[in-house]
Amino acid sequence: MFTSLHTPILHPRYCHHPTPSCTQFSPLALPPFHRTLSFLAPPPLLPAAPALSAASAAKPDKSGEQKWVHEGLIMESLPNGMFRVRLDNEDLILGYISGKIRKNYVRILPGDRVKVEVTRYDSSKGRIVYRLRSSTPS
């Protein structure tokens, strides 16, 4: 039934008589991590080449985006966290709340002074990133 192609390759440790099938297998020909005594033990980890960390690979470069930071006064409150903001240079823009301000439930009311990031691509909209504290105690 079995031909020469179907003869099993035996390990030299368990082969007690030298046959061509026993002598053709050499454990020293394999890389060192394949020479484990137990087939259940995983091969040892090899040192990996230094790579970029996951945090730096996931986030885009923030310094590449040019933004202007202006201070302004909230003129009008609009729906969905949008505000009319009068900047110090007398421009009137549409400001929306940043995620940190939304997450921390910072209250912004008309008359508050805020810091706004305005992108250079659309200077009519900006992100409100900070609510400035009022100078008068109330």
Curated annotation (Swiss-Prot):
GO terms for molecular function: ribosome binding; RNA binding; translation initiation factor activity. InterPro entries: NA-bd_OB-fold, RNA-binding_domain_S1_IF1, S1_domain, TIF_IF1. It is found in: Plastid, Chloroplast. Residues 58-133 form the S1-like domain. Keywords: Chloroplast, Initiation factor, Plastid, Protein biosynthesis, Transit peptide. It comes from the Eukaryota. It comes from Glycine max. One of the essential components for the initiation of protein synthesis. Stabilizes the binding of IF-2 and IF-3 on the 30S subunit to which N-formylmethionyl-tRNA(fMet) subsequently binds. Helps modulate mRNA selection, yielding the 30S pre-initiation complex (PIC). Upon addition of the 50S ribosomal subunit IF-1, IF-2 and IF-3 are released leaving the mature 70S translation initiation complex. This is Translation initiation factor IF-1, chloroplastic.
